Amino acid sequence: MKNKKGFTLIELVLVISIVALLLMAIGLTSGVKENARVHAAAESVKSLRTAAESYIAAGNMTYTGVSIAGLQTAGYLPANFSATGSNPWGGNYSIAVDSDPNKVDISLTGVNSTAAARLSALFANSASATSYSYNAWIVTF
């Protein structure tokens, strides 16, 4: 009998199974990374909200004039809090008075729609409103 070269069916099934497992592992790690980004952004939003509430508690009647730089100067935000290019998607953070001066808007740029939906869900019970447009997510407190 001649010595035949090639792959057996078992070898092919084994290789295909290993490739499938590797592809699944890659997919799972990307989901974990996105989850970490969403939660990191949520923590930063909470810090900005707390700083803004401290601004009001210090005797300011409305959020008029609130800014990241102002909150840092007043000591409500750490001096090393960076608003530019520092959110988990490489975009910016900003804080500003809402059209209602008793409310504040916190926005993140560079956010994808899936992450924006997850952020909105996280703040559904505590925010007055959330919106997403042109890669910018805004939450109002």
Language-model-detected regions and their locations in the chain:
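N-terminal single-pass transmembrane signal-anchor helix
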Residues: 1-30
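Glycine-centered flexibility motif
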Residues: 13-14, 31, 36, 90
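A general structural signal for well-ordered secondary-structure junctions
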Residues: 19, 77, 128-129
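Conserved hydrophobic/amphipathic alpha-helical signal-anchor segments
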Residues: 31-70
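Extracellular/periplasmic head regions of type IV pilus-like filament subunits
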Residues: 57-115, 140
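Low-complexity, S/T/G/P-rich flexible repeat/linker segments used as non-globular hinges
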Residues: 112-141
